[in-house]
Amino acid sequence: MAATNIYLNFQGNAAEAFNLYKSVFNTEFSAPIMRMGDMPAQEGMPQLSDAEKKMVMHVALPILGGTQIMGTDMLESMGHKLIVGNNTTISLELDSKEEADRIYNALAQGGTDCVAPHDEFWGYWGVCLDRFGIRWMFNVLNSRNA
């Protein structure tokens, strides 16, 4: 079955971020976290340091309604440079203001550029850049907000 997943890149703290997300959404990883050190050596691939071997190669976590967020740590030694920006947003359409507030409050701790959920003309809305540089948007549409 086809699916759309959200893929997030981190700079050495993917495991920490995904453990927070796991607790926020009260769910379990789809499979054990795969570490860079689990990757078989490939021709032309640079030797990984012990610290790099512990970084996340791949992690997947189901969140709401079958959506999965996935992630990795980007390694500069392999030619990947992370640039944190606002080009990735995870938009959550939630069923209640209480659920929006609970998730917002957990993700806003240590975050920046946060607008607490509040009533807008279309529903209840908020946004926050969490402490890992991931932007989250919270929506409870008026039709769900009875």
Positions of predicted regions on the chain:
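Vicinal oxygen chelate
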Residues: A2, A31-R35, A60-I63, I69-L82, ...
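Core segments of cupin and vicinal oxygen chelate
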Residues: L8-G66
